[in-house]
């Protein structure tokens, strides 16, 4: 055991704010299931200004980091290499430390989104809608670039956000049309709707959900279910939640950081559900 502990066995999630993060619950559940009793997974409040110093202070015991806002772009200059997936959206949520000391960045949000959708039977769609703009919305576009064969409509609040989303569409090879947020209820005509906005933002839209809608992917996990997700399910639609995304992206992180595959998806999901239920 002593020789194992001398190797890479530490990981953590960084961000600001970070107290609410479920990542420690998910990763620790994976370690327990995999028999990695000597592995540790922590949580650190780190903002953009503090990130370089934090990274510089890490030693050879560290296997990897999970990153949340506002660090997903700030970390990129501090890395030795970045995966094509992360580079495509200029966002890194996973850092893996190799045996030779290199720091490689990846984005598991995008394949995590795809895995969560496929788990609910969504393999390909003719069109899709995205509610909101920003880092999560750009990841949604990257995921849609692989499963949407038609147009994506993004509902946003400003001309600047509209231009940003169209720019991401061009970069990712997705046909993106933008519409004003005041018309967001029209999104529900699409077979797949991805809601990427903060808690409460879509509550007023719940009354507009039609009977037998398609699939809603609401990236929030707390509070859950959201008002929109509740209405969607009540009207016969399929719902994919933020915990689904969180678990699937964490599975990929565990596999990269520990070198063990497959990670215990169901044990991690159960731990996440229990943690949310106790809050």
Where are these regions (language model features)?
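Adenosine-phosphate binding glycine-rich loop
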Residues: 219-279
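NAD(P)-binding Rossmann-fold cofactor-contacting core
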Residues: 149-172
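Short, conserved loop/helix-junction motifs that constitute active-site signature segments
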Residues: 4-5, 122-124, 146-148, 207-214
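Phosphate/diphosphate ligand-binding glycine-rich loop within oxidoreductases
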Residues: 2-120, 223
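Rossmann-like adenosine-cofactor binding region
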Residues: 170-240
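Glycine-rich adenosine-cofactor-binding loop
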Residues: 15, 107-110, 117-146, 156-157
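Short, charged/polar "capping" segments at the starts of alpha-helices
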Residues: 74, 159-165, 204, 224-227
């Amino acid at each position: 055991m002593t020789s194992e502990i001398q190797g890479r066995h530490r990981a953590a999630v960084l961000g600001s704010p970070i107290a609410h993060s479920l990542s420690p619950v998910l990763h620790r559940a994976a370690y327990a299931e995999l028999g990695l009793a000597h592995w540790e997974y922590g949580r650190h409040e780190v903002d953009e200004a503090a990130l370089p110093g934090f990274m510089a202070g890490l030693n050879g015991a560290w296997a990897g980091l999970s990153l949340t806002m506002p660090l997903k772009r700030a970390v990129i200059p501090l890395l030795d290499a970045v995966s094509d997936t992360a580079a495509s959206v200029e966002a890194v949520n996973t850092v893996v430390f190799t045996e030779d000391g290199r720091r490689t960045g990846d984005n598991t949000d995008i394949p995590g989104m795809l895995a969560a959708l496929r788990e609910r039977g969504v393999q390909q769609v003719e069109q899709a809608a995205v509610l909101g703009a920003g880092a999560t919305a750009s990841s949604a576009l990257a995921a849609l670039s692989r499963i949407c064969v038609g147009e994506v409509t993004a509902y946003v609040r400003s001309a600047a956000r509209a231009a940003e989303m169209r720019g991401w569409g061009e970069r990712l090879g997705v046909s993106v049309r933008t519409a004003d947020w005041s018309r967001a209820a029209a999104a529900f005509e699409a077979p797949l709707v991805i809601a990427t906005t903060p808690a409460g933002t879509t509550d007023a839209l719940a009354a507009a959900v039609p009977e037998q809608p398609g699939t809603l992917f609401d990236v929030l996990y707390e509070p859950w279910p959201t008002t929109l997700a509740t209405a969607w399910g009540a009207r016969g639609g399929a719902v994919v939640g933020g915990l689904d995304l969180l678990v699937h992206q964490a599975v990929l992180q565990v596999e990269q950081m520990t070198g063990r595959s497959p990670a215990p998806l169901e044990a991690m999901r159960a731990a996440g559900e229990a943690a949310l239920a106790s809050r």
